[in-house]
A protein has these predicted regions:
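Short, T/G/N/S-enriched strand-turn elements that build extracellular solenoid repeat scaffolds
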Residues: 69-76, 90-103, 113-114, 285-290, ...
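Ligand-binding pocket scaffold of soluble enzyme catalytic domains
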Residues: 38, 77, 104, 115-116, ...
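Predominantly extracellular beta-rich ligand-binding scaffolds that present long acidic/polar faces
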Residues: 98-100, 119-120, 398, 402-495
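Short, solvent-exposed linear motifs at loop/edge-of-secondary-structure regions
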Residues: 156-169, 195-203, 236-248, 378-397, ...
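Right-handed parallel beta-helix
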Residues: 100, 238-249, 270-281, 293-307, ...
Length: 562
């Protein structure tokens, strides 16, 4: 008997259930305690500006072009473009884009910024100001409830309308959920201070001497016993963008780009963007995002470690060759329609990272130094990300809120397609929610491949190498013991309307709200969308997901890059 292809399975389900399913089922919506209003509140305000006024056009000189590009950026009025013509621009030192300026090439692969061998410094190209930094925190008082848009300080704060302020509070390891910077190891860098791992970066609309009104309401209720405080961010860069360009770090990558560095660094930014930028070569992080608010990374192509080959070399080992690394704090950002491949982990999120959307990214063909190990594609890797939405991604690997540096909670995976890579048995779990990963929401996902996964769920049992759809509550990647399993992970997990390969069907949680919305952050099909159906992924779609285009060919929904 021939098998029905996986992606066409919903058609059979619909035919079998015809006549037995009531018309007009209730539409599912995320519980208010597990979500925030992402729609209209992520990415550059009013979307990316279309700037047409050219301040200067530069062409490769044949020598070191860094100073000429920096000079053009320094002289560029706000709202105008520094245009780079076709060819390879050689950079002996880093280039940073400043507020109000767009640095635009002639297209990915047409205009190339190539770092020189021996280049010093923590990045090749950046958006940010060397004056970036945090001021001393000001204690907050009064009610600070989720959804509120006003905060009150215990003393005059000195803030101005338009300032960026980081709101946080002390960790609460015994709380519900637990918030802790202690996991397998102890983190000291995932917030303003080691014991302040949960928070929100906000923009101020209005101020008095001791109050401030927020552009986006609070994602979380901050409580007085945990001493909430707010610290202004200085040296913020706003309204800057990089477009239509390739940044090649293949020769210039070095350990100087570790930690807060990267091939491209966005640091202390608001309403900034990368659009149609190719990044070749990640020493540790291809794109490093630090203290970012309402910024967008869209339609970029990010790939290869340093050196690019061999695929199983040490350059793809621990602490090497990440894609986009978001830490230690960032809020209301949008990471959309990017193609990230031949790297260890396409997305890592760590610290007080809240209210962001990672959506419609294509994450195939990960590399790792251990050829049998299944690495993380989208990972929460440090305390304490909350209220982030992971929607519509097409990935090969493992989705993992891990416990390496501590806790995370209240993040949502909606309408994603994930499968395990072929021929690997190390860490063979599609969704690996480890110790301290509480109140996760997984709805409308298409998980696994028929004949690959052997069991539905592993929780509180000794492991024997089983391939599973879910692994819940284990202490670390290498933990295979039932002892010490965190039962709170499964007890607080909301799963609804996910198709998985073990059941070969959609599993509902018993409620009647079985009509899934197309998106949790978009009102409709976005302007950059290609020919793929909308929405593209879900157990209610026929087929359940679009064809895999293969690496280097765009995303499944926008083959030309968006």
């Amino acid at each position: 008997m021939s098998k029905v292809p996986l992606k066409w399975a919903p058609l059979l389900v619909l035919l079998l259930l015809a006549g037995s399913v009531a018309v007009g089922q209730a539409t599912w919506s995320p519980p208010p305690g597990r979500s925030v209003p992402w729609q209209g509140n992520v990415g550059v305000l009013h979307d990316l500006p279309l700037r047409s006024a050219i301040h200067a056009t530069l062409y490769p000189s044949g020598g070191d072009d860094a100073q000429a590009i920096r000079g053009a950026i320094a002289g560029c009025p706000a709202g105008k473009v520094v245009m780079l013509g076709p060819g390879v621009f050689s950079l002996g030192s880093a280039v940073s884009v400043t507020s109000g300026v767009t640095l635009r090439g002639s297209g990915m692969g047409i205009t190339v910024l190539r770092g020189r061998r021996g280049m010093a410094g923590p990045f090749v190209v950046g958006i940010g100001d060397p004056a970036f930094g945090e001021e001393r925190g000001v204690p907050l008082r009064g009610a600070l409830f989720k959804g509120g848009d006003t905060v009150t300080t215990a003393s005059p704060h000195g803030w101005r309308a338009g300032d960026l302020v980081m709101i946080d509070q002390l960790n609460d390891p015994k709380g519900d959920p637990p918030v802790t910077n202690v996991g397998v190891g102890t983190s000291s860098w995932n917030g303003r201070a080691p014991d302040r791992s949960l928070g929100q970066l906000v923009s101020l609309k209005e101020v008095t001497s001791t109050t401030a009104t927020l552009e986006i309401p609070l994602y979380w209720s901050f409580v007085s016993r945990l001493r909430p405080a707010a610290a202004r961010i200085g040296g913020v860069t706003s309204g800057a963008g990089i477009e239509e360009i390739t940044v090649d770090n293949g020769e210039s990558g070095s350990p100087a780009q570790n930690d807060s560095g990267g091939t491209i660094v966005m640091k202390g930014v608001a309403n900034c963007w990368l659009h149609r930028v190719e990044v070749i070569g990640s020493w540790q992080s291809a794109v490093r995002v630090i203290a970012a608010y309402r910024s967008t990374i869209r339609s970029c192509r990010i790939h290869e470690g340093i050196p690019a080959l061999p695929a199983g070399g040490p350059q793809y080992g621990p602490r090497r060759a990440y894609g986009i690394f978001i830490s230690p704090y960032a809020s209301a950002n949008l990471f959309e329609n990017n193609e990230i491949y031949h790297l260890v982990s396409p997305f890592l999120i760590a610290g007080a990272v809240s209210g962001n959307v990672i959506a419609y990214n294509y994450l195939p063909d990960p590399y790792y130094s251990d050829p049998n190990w299944i690495q993380v594609t989208i990972g929460f890797h440090g305390p304490h990300p909350v209220m982030n939405l992971i929607e519509g991604n097409y990935s090969v690997g493992r989705m993992a809120p891990d416990n390496y540096w501590g806790s995370s909670s209240h993040n949502t995976f909606f309408r994603n397609r994930n499968r395990l890579p072929e021929g690997k048995r190390g860490a063979p779990w599609n969704f690996d929610l480890q110790h301290h990963a509480h109140y996760y929401t997984l709805v409308g996902n298409v998980i696994g491949e028929p004949g690959t996964e052997e069991v539905y769920q592993l929780q509180g049992v000794d492991l024997a190498g089983e391939k599973a759809v879910y692994r819940l509550g284990y202490h670390s990647d290498g933990d295979g013991s039932r002892e010490g399993n965190d039962k709170g992970v499964g007890a607080t997990l909301l799963r609804h309307g996910n198709w998985d390969s073990v059941h070969g069907a959609t599993v509902w949680n018993g409620t009647e709200d079985r009509s899934l919305p197309p998106s949790l952050y978009l009102a409709g099909k976005p302007a950059w969308w290609g020919d793929a159906p909308w929405p593209p992924i879900g157990p209610d779609r026929v087929p359940m997901y679009p064809p895999d285009p293969g690496v280097g060919r765009g995303t499944p929904w926008s083959l030309q890059g968006g």
